[in-house]
UniProtKB/Swiss-Prot annotation:
Record's function text: Required for rescue of stalled ribosomes mediated by trans-translation. Binds to transfer-messenger RNA (tmRNA), required for stable association of tmRNA with ribosomes. tmRNA and SmpB together mimic tRNA shape, replacing the anticodon stem-loop with SmpB. tmRNA is encoded by the ssrA gene; the 2 termini fold to resemble tRNA(Ala) and it encodes a 'tag peptide', a short internal open reading frame. During trans-translation Ala-aminoacylated tmRNA acts like a tRNA, entering the A-site of stalled ribosomes, displacing the stalled mRNA.
Cross-referenced Gene3D superfamilies: 2.40.280.10
InterPro entries: SmpB, SsrA-bd_prot, SsrA-bd_prot_CS
SUPFAM superfamilies linked to this entry: Small protein B (SmpB)
One Gene Ontology molecular-function label: RNA binding
NCBIfam families, per database record: PRK05422.1 (NF003843), smpB (TIGR00086)
Listed GO CC annotations: cytosol
Phylogenetic placement of the source organism: Bacteria, Bacillati, Chloroflexota, Chloroflexia, Chloroflexales
Keywords: Cytoplasm, RNA-binding
Example of a GO biological process term: trans-translation
UniProt keyword Nucleotide-binding present: no
Name this polypeptide is given: SsrA-binding protein
Organism this protein belongs to: Roseiflexus sp. (strain RS-1)
Length: 158
């Protein structure tokens, strides 16, 4: 039987990041949140599109991720929807990531946000931007794969 902290539920997925970037490596990080933010996350009110991660003074910060204000709380107790949020990583992970981001053309993007037990986690990816022709190649490969699967499906029907 699975314990409560083993259950993982994906709250938000950043499919646009996988379309716009080549993901080289992924890391799991915790997030420092307020009470109304975690309640909104549990309600699924999160948008990762356009978000990015920066390393500032040896700390990882998540920017431009929209967590909607919690509906049941008053205006006084609510949070700012797109405020920077501190990511919780080990010091050696941060220094390793910072060294990799220093290289030309690499960035850190949030890939998905999920709940593991009672804790919110974000999967961040070390990414390199795709050019337009890379995106077209991906689309052509996907369409070719669909055509092959369609042909095989028709062949097995006979």
């Amino acid at each position: 039987m699975a314990r409560g902290n083993d259950i993982e539920r994906v709250v938000a997925d950043n499919r646009k990041a996988r379309h716009d970037y080549f993901i080289e490596e992924t890391y799991e990080a915790g997030i420092a949140l307020t009470g109304s933010e975690i309640k909104s996350i549990r309600a699924g009110q999160v948008n990762l599109r356009g978000g990015y991660v920066r390393i500032v003074d040896g700390e990882a910060w998540l920017y431009d991720v929209h967590i909607a204000p919690y509906e049941q709380s008053g205006a006084y107790f609510n949070h700012e929807p797109t405020r920077p949020r501190k990511l919780l990583l080990h010091r050696r992970e941060i220094s390793r990531i910072a060294g990799q981001v220093e290289r030309q053309g690499y960035t850190l993007v949030p890939l998905r946000l999920y709940l593991r037990g009672r804790r919110a986690k974000v999967e961040i990816g070390l990414a390199r931007g795709k050019k337009l022709y890379d995106k077209r190649d991906d689309i052509a490969r996907r369409e070719a794969r669909r055509d092959i699967e369609r042909a095989l499906k028709e062949r097995t029907r006979r």
